[in-house]
Amino acid sequence: MAQQRRGGRRRRKVDFIAANHIEYIDYKDTNLLDRFISERGKILPRRVTGTSAKNQRKLTIAIKRARIMGLLPFVSED
């Protein structure tokens, strides 16, 4: 017998930065940047977070700056 697929509408991800009207992504705002980093310390992709391409580029730059300044770890401490 063939298995049936369960359908269902997936909820569209919302760009957190655009929804909260954040104009400038500051590298010193580690609380915001932590939302977009995995527990292993990797930057989460757009398909997971739902950010737009423009905001994802800004996020990546801010996270890399924060890492260089020592505000965020490069890898997690397990």
UniProtKB/Swiss-Prot annotation:
Pfam families: Ribosomal_S18. The keyword RNA-binding applies. InterPro entries: Ribosomal_bS18, Ribosomal_bS18_CS, Ribosomal_bS18_sf. GO terms for molecular function: small ribosomal subunit rRNA binding; structural constituent of ribosome. One of its GO terms (biological process) is translation. The keyword Acetylation does not apply. Keywords: Ribonucleoprotein, Ribosomal protein, RNA-binding, rRNA-binding. GO terms for cellular component: cytosolic small ribosomal subunit. Part of the 30S ribosomal subunit. Forms a tight heterodimer with protein bS6. Binds as a heterodimer with protein bS6 to the central domain of the 16S rRNA, where it helps stabilize the platform of the 30S subunit. Belongs to the bacterial ribosomal protein bS18 family. This is Small ribosomal subunit protein bS18. The gene is rpsR.
